[in-house]
Amino acid sequence: MASGNCTTPTTFILSGLTDNPGLQMPLFMVFLAIYTITLLTNLGLIALISVDLHLQTPMYIFLQNLSFTDAAYSTVITPKMLATFLEERKTISYIGCILQYFSFVLLTVTESLLLAVMAYDRYVAICKPLLYPSIMTKAVCWRLVKGLYSLAFLNSLVHTSGLLKLSFCSSNVVNHFFCDNSPLFQISSSSTTLNELLVFIFGSLFAMSSIITILISYVFIILTVVRIRSKDGKYKAFSTCTSHLMAVSLFHGTVIFMYLRPVKLFSLDTDKIASLFYTVVIPMLNPLIYSWRNKEVKDALRRVIATNVWIH
């Protein structure tokens, strides 16, 4: 953590989204509203799935964990970002930065793997409907969830351990609104070659394995659906996948742009906008995407409201 006369900084200074004083309060209000909506919708969906027996199915177990991941994702990033709009000196402690980085990497991989597992669940439900209850049992679902959390944890541990070995002698100003790897590597006075290689290898491994699983699942889903004769059957099959495909496109599209694009296209300012999208905006959109046209979720919400009204 230290080399020669270099001492590890006790704090980092975050540059934030903008240094324009006139934009600080408007941006604070906008992102406070987004964060509030994110928490209310994701925690609301978690609670709804927990209390409604009709939603105790594999698809909603995974959706519940996706909502938890999104709520945690937003909470790791947004509160500190909101604070930077109100503080003249936008600081984060060294330990706070490391913890934020660890949590961010953990949740990014968790979401990626969850989207892959959800695609596999849809594949089994549509392509093997008779075997679905025996294949996707609750025990299997929770083993998959625990497995992907474990993989994400180990991956985050590797990257965070590498970050702890870096020295920051020349600067402690992070050109970002949170502690991400690219701006931290940029100000490191140590060689970051190994760190960058690990980010690329593990990032590619998890992203591509998730994307390949999703693509293969949907190839089989499409081949099965086109053989369904009734229009209602086709519509029902596709409608269960539309929300998931939207979530996959938003998340993986942004992550691929962020971490797997050519070096010549790299720009920290561009990264800020892309990071803002998948750390703040997507966690707000996901519960809306999954519940907006979902009849089962709407029916469950009506049942819960009706029960509470009847009790009172």
From Swiss-Prot:
What membrane topology does the annotation report for this chain? Multi-pass membrane protein
Where in the sequence does glycosylation occur per the annotation? Answer: N5
Mapped to this chain, the residue ranges on the Cytoplasmic side of the membrane are 50-57, 121-139, 227-239, 293-312
Q: Where in the cell is it found?
A: Cell membrane
Q: Which GO terms describe its cellular component?
A: plasma membrane
- Topology Extracellular: residue spans: 1-26, 80-100, 165-205, 261-271
tRNA processing as UniProt keyword: no
| Domain of life per record | Eukaryota
Disulfide feature: C97-C179
- State if RNA-binding is listed as a keyword: no
What parts of the sequence cross the membrane?
27-49, 58-79, 101-120, 140-164, 206-226, 240-260, 272-292
Q: Which UniProt keywords apply?
A: Cell membrane, Disulfide bond, G-protein coupled receptor, Glycoprotein, Membrane, Olfaction, Receptor, Sensory transduction, Transducer, Transmembrane, Transmembrane helix
GO molecular function list? G protein-coupled receptor activity; odorant binding; olfactory receptor activity
The record's annotation in Gene3D superfamilies points to: Rhodopsin 7-helix transmembrane proteins (1.20.1070.10)
Per the record, the major location class is: membrane
Assigned protein family: Belongs to the G-protein coupled receptor 1 family.
Record PANTHER family = OLFACTORY RECEPTOR
Q: What does this protein do?
A: Odorant receptor.
- Can you name this protein? Olfactory receptor-like protein COR4
Native organism is Gallus gallus
